[in-house]
Structures are given as structure tokens and as C-alpha cells.
């Protein structure tokens, strides 16, 4: 019997073949990890466009909540035109359970030589861009269409501090990294830039990508 790892190059080749066109291609930053897993397990080998949907259910279950965003990566749905919606214009946000504000403040005080960039700005600026980007809330129990309000008397006193990691990372690694530094929330841009949001922030931090090695 051949070792199972020999299937990996074939899956990777198929993955790459689906990403040739830069405009009509899937969201690599968001989908790469899960798509690779499903292809390696050979759960998405059929082609609905050719009338063969024998694996559609298994493939959909494998991709889970990423099905809508990633089905085109495995040839299950029509390719989308991403030229009008670059990955940097979309992000996934989530509140973190049991944040540690004192830890976050300690790690973000003063200059650091670590692999992240600390950005501080007024809460007013944070809220002014509240609807600039499309964000997908991971927490399904969170109420939708919640309007964030801050009393005008205190707006000038509130400052929001966020941390951008220099390098690209998966959404799972982003969540784990932000939890480990005591952040209250995180924002993961679909180009794989990770932003940890501090306790003083009212919304989900900045909607601008500022990861020095992950800007595209």
C-alpha cells in the first residue's frame, strides 16, 4: 500500500490549477487550509457542472461554514469575480471569551521588538468607519444589526488600541494569538492579516489592513 502522503502533491496540484486566473479565482487566504484538507481526503472529486454530484454533500460538510466562500475553489460552484471585492475589503470578526485587559495593556505599552505593530486611535475614528467593510460575525448568537453608541461627552477620552501581526496567518492562528495576549476581540482580514482588538475599543478595531508583510 502506498503511503497516504503521496496523495498530497496531487491535491496541491489540483488546488493550484483552480487558482490560475487572478480575477476569477477563489479566496486563497480564506480557503486554502480547509480546501487542502477536503481535497486530500478526496471528498470533493465529483463535478456538478458535468452532472456528477455524488460527492456534493460530503464536500459541503467538509467545508462547513466556508462552503459559500470556498465552493468555487473545489469546482463545486461557478467561479466568482473577485476583482471588485479584494480580500482586504472583507474580514471576519469575533469576540473572545475571558479576555485579560491587564495583559493586553502590558504587552502594548511602549515600543516592542516583537513581530507586531501597535496602533492607537480615537474611538470616534473607529466608529466612523463602522460600515465601511463587510464583516462576517463568527458568533451566530450575537444579535444582528446592533448599533454601537458612545456618549459624545466621553468620545474624546476613549482611545482604541489594536495589534497587527507582521506576517499572514490562518484565522485559527489569529484567534489563538489574540487570546494569548489577552485581547477582547479579533479581526481576521480575508488576505490573512490578523488584528487583535484591545479592551477600550467599542467596535472591532480598525477596518484597514496594516500587517507589514501581509498587505495584498
Swiss-Prot record:
Swiss-Prot/TrEMBL keywords: Developmental protein, Glycoprotein, Secreted, Signal
GO biological process: regulation of BMP signaling pathway
Domain of life the protein comes from: Eukaryota
Signal peptide, first to last residue: 1-25
Keyword Signal: yes
InterPro entries with a match to the protein in the record: Tsg
Residues with glycosylation annotation: 52, 81, 145
GO cellular component labels: extracellular space
Main location: secreted
The keyword Magnesium is assigned to this record: no
Location(s), subcellular: Secreted
Tissue: Posterior defects are induced by overexpression. This may arise through alteration of bmp4 or chrd function in the developing tailbud region.
Free-text comment on this protein's domains from its UniProt entry: The N-terminal domain is sufficient to interact with bmp4.
Other information: Knockdown of tsg and bmp7 results in the siren phenotype with loss of posteroventral cell fates associated with decreased BMP activity.
Family note: Belongs to the twisted gastrulation protein family.
Protein task: Involved in dorsal-ventral patterning, permitting peak BMP signaling by antagonizing the residual anti-BMP activity of the cleavage products of chrd. Functions to promote the formation of ventral mesoderm by increasing the activity of bmp7 and other BMPS. Seems to antagonize BMP signaling by forming ternary complexes with chrd and BMPs, thereby preventing BMPs from binding to their receptors. In addition to the anti-BMP function, also has pro-BMP activity, partly mediated by cleavage and degradation of chrd, which releases BMPs from ternary complexes.
Quaternary structure annotation from Swiss-Prot or TrEMBL: Binds directly to bmp2, bmp4 and bmp7 and can form a ternary complex with bmps and chordin, thus preventing the binding of bmps to their cell surface receptors.
The protein's name in its UniProt record: Twisted gastrulation protein homolog 1-A
Source organism of the structure: Xenopus laevis (African clawed frog)
Gene name in the database record: twsg1-a
Amino acid at each position: 500500500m502506498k503511503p497516504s502522503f503521496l496523495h498530497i502533491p496531487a491535491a496541491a496540484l489540483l488546488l493550484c490549477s483552480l487558482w490560475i486566473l487572478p480575477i476569477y479565482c477563489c479566496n486563497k487566504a480564506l480557503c486554502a487550509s480547509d480546501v487542502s484538507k477536503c481535497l486530500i481526503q478526496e471528498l470533493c472529486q465529483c463535478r456538478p457542472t458535468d452532472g456528477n454530484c455524488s460527492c456534493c454533500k460530503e464536500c459541503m460538510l467538509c467545508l462547513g461554514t466556508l462552503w459559500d466562500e470556498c465552493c468555487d475553489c473545489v469546482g463545486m460552484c461557478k467561479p466568482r469575480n473577485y476583482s471588485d471585492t479584494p480580500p482586504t475589503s472583507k474580514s471576519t470578526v469575533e469576540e473572545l471569551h475571558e479576555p485579560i485587559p491587564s495583559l493586553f495593556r502590558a504587552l502594548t505599552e511602549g515600543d516592542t521588538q516583537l513581530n507586531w505593530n501597535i496602533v492607537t486611535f480615537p474611538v470616534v475614528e473607529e466608529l466612523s468607519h463602522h460600515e465601511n467593510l463587510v464583516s462576517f460575525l463568527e458568533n451566530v448568537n450575537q444579535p444582528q444589526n446592533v448599533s454601537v453608541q458612545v456618549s459624545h461627552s466621553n468620545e474624546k477620552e476613549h482611545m482604541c488600541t489594536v495589534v497587527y501581526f507582521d506576517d499572514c496567518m490562518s484565522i485559527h492562528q489569529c484567534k489563538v494569538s489574540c487570546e494569548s495576549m489577552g485581547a477582547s476581540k479579533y479581526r481576521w482580514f480575508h488576505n490573512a492579516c490578523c488584528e487583535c482588538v484591545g479592551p477600550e475599543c467599542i467596535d472591532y478595531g480598525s477596518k484597514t489592513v496594516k500587517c507589514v508583510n501581509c498587505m495584498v
